[in-house]
Amino acid sequence: MRTLILLPLLLIACSKNQPAPAAPEPTGGATTITAQIDQGKQLYVDKCSKCHGDAGQGVPDKGPPVVGPEAFPEKPRPNAKRDVDFHTAADVFAWTSKHMPGNAPGSLTTDQYLAIFAFDLTANGVKLDKPLDGPAAQAIVLHP
């Protein structure tokens, strides 16, 4: 099993010369995409909705939209917490798993972050046929 590497994706923004890191891998979470999405929905309500809204629409002065056309822009918004570009779902995952939730950054398991992101991707119209993992996240190009 490959070693889970989250932080190097974030460092790419600081140094274009570094090689791409290995993708995060789940450690035994949901075995079906339906179960992963259901788990992600509940985790989203519990951990994310206060700042990102009950439908992912964003909350002014708390958190940006995570569902809809304004979700996950390639470049950071002015005054955003993030300072990295989002080209793939793996980029979003790497940043989110280090910086979210805002009141307890990095406090969830890899499987929990993947579940939330699987829920969020499907809410944005991305079709997932199997549970989201690192290789699948790297293959989802948000901004070519």
Predicted feature locations:
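An amphipathic alpha-helix signature
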Residues: 86-97, 110, 114-118
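C-terminal motif of bacterial Sec signal peptides marking the signal peptidase cleavage site
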Residues: 11-13
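Sec-dependent signal peptide recognition
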Residues: 1-7
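Flexible coil segments in periplasmic/lumen-exposed cytochrome c-class electron-transfer proteins
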Residues: 103-144
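Sequence/structural segment immediately N-terminal to covalent heme-attachment motifs in c-type
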Residues: 34-59, 63, 67-69
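Gly/Gly-Pro-rich "capping" loops immediately C-terminal to redox-active cysteine motifs
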Residues: 56-92
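Electrostatic cytochrome c docking/interface patches
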Residues: 18-43, 59, 104
